Amino acid sequence: MIVAIIQARMDSSRLPNKVMLDLCNEPVLWHVVNRTRSSKRIERLVVATSENSSNDTIREYCKQKDIECVSGNENDVLDRYYKVMNYANIKDDDIVVRITADCPLIDPELIDEVIEHHIVTNSDYTSNTIEPTFPDGLDCEVIQATVLKKAWEEAKLKSEREHVTLYIRNHPELFRIESYRGNEDLSGMRWTLDEEEDYILIKRIYEELYSNNKMFTTKEILDFLNSDPNIGAINSMHTRNQGLTKSLKEDGCTEEDLKKVNKNG
């Protein structure tokens, strides 16, 4: 079984309530769920939110829309994933696909490509963020359930508990890790939703493309942005991996290590 787990919460320090912001009369979370469900390989989808009362909106919305939702620890997101694994009765040989709710432009075809690469290479962990070539916001991680369980058992650093797969990436000697790369380096593009400027950009994209094709493609986004470079520059002042960098600093990560993170996604 291949299960997508979408982590979502309301208490974002940089853009509060971002997962419920409106995009063409539907909240961001709905679009992330809908686009992820359009994957041909994913068989089940569960939203993983925090137990904090601020996330009651997410729980109520998921119930209303018949979306499976599990609540767990606010900061120990790895434990939240493990709780979903138990809830969904995920077996050791099953596959977990990690998606975050700040990616309303997530590409279902790309999700399938990463899953296929994971299976063909017999990998423990496969991601398109290890050597970034895709726009920030098309992030997809595919993990063997038994490996995610080991990470839950062994991860000790706060950053490894908050950033679910960091323990795996920190221990390439223990796991078969595969990087999925695109044919063109588009890693300088920012399509994630963390700042007000990100929302302005993504809203423009939806207003332009959604009415003609509700499952608009990465190519359509690129064509639109290439038609007017000023649009893509709306959020260009923000950098990749700001949240991860903050967590690593709190764990005492060196400047040299931080440079590696920002280089390798």
Predicted segments with their positions:
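N-terminal nucleotide-binding beta1-loop-alpha1 segment
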Residues: 1-15
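A short, N-terminal amphipathic alpha-helix
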Residues: 28-45, 58-60, 64-65
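Short phosphate-binding loop-to-helix
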Residues: 51-121
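Conserved core of the sugar-phosphate nucleotidyltransferase
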Residues: 105-189, 220-265
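Short, conserved phosphate/pyrophosphate- and ester-handling motifs at nucleotide-, phospho-/glycolipid
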Residues: 195
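Short active-site loop/helix that positions an aromatic residue
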Residues: 200-207
